[in-house]
Amino acid sequence: MESSASPPRSRKAPEERREEILSEAASIALDEGLERITLRAVATRLGVRPGLISHYFPAAEDLVDEAFVRAATIERERFFPDAGSPLERLAHFVHHIETGASLPLARLWLNARHLSRFIPSLEATLQEQDSLDRARLRAIIEDGVASGDFAAVDPEAASIRILIAVDGGGSYVNSTDDLTHPAHVHFVADVAEWTLGLAPGTLGAVATS
């Protein structure tokens, strides 16, 4: 007579399990918002007990912080490719925003900035991730100034102006209003071109060429 007992589950290595938990939490952050990250929600998605999640992340706030870092890191790599000229890399950055590809990240940042008022550790995480984004954008601008693609601007000041434009546009991400006016759609491109001494429409032309 054959046994009907279920085969024993294989135990995952701690590093593998932790990565699995973080990946799922980051997915929840992008899809539903940081406040939806709970030990139970992650456990349900993974088909495990909440106690397993708390073994790796005793406090839900720790999981929220690290999930935000994971999601922001993944999206950063999509924003800032290493290949191409400085002008092409900046055009990719702007095109990623204008086409709506960055909407999940915009929602995540808006969500995180709100929650950081109540979670001090998240505020520190936000500052760190913002600094990393600024460094990547600053590197593109430094390369562009050196190559002559951009005007001789202060790369730090230029990166701050452009990212403020990104955040300003992102603040409308949950709006149901009609935001198709060119002044809204191309706001980041307009600011970047003005800041870097580029002719209007340059970045759009490069992105679609």
What are these regions (language model features)?
Residues 101-124, 174:
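Amphipathic alpha-helical segments used for helix-helix packing
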Residues 69-75:
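Short, basic, alpha-helical segments at the C-terminal edge of helix-turn-helix-like DNA-binding modules
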Residues 20, 24-62, 66:
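Helix-turn-helix
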Residues 123-127, 131, 145-209:
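Hydrophobic/aromatic-rich alpha-helical bundle segments in the mid-to-C-terminal region
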Residues 66, 77-107, 158-162, 185, ...:
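Hydrophobic alpha-helical connector segments
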Residues 58-62, 80, 84, 117, ...:
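Residues in soluble alpha-helical coiled-coils and helical-bundle/repeat scaffolds
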Residues 20, 24-32, 77-78, 108, ...:
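Solvent-exposed, amphipathic alpha-helical segments
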Residues 1-16, 201-209:
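N-terminal intrinsically disordered/low-complexity leader segments
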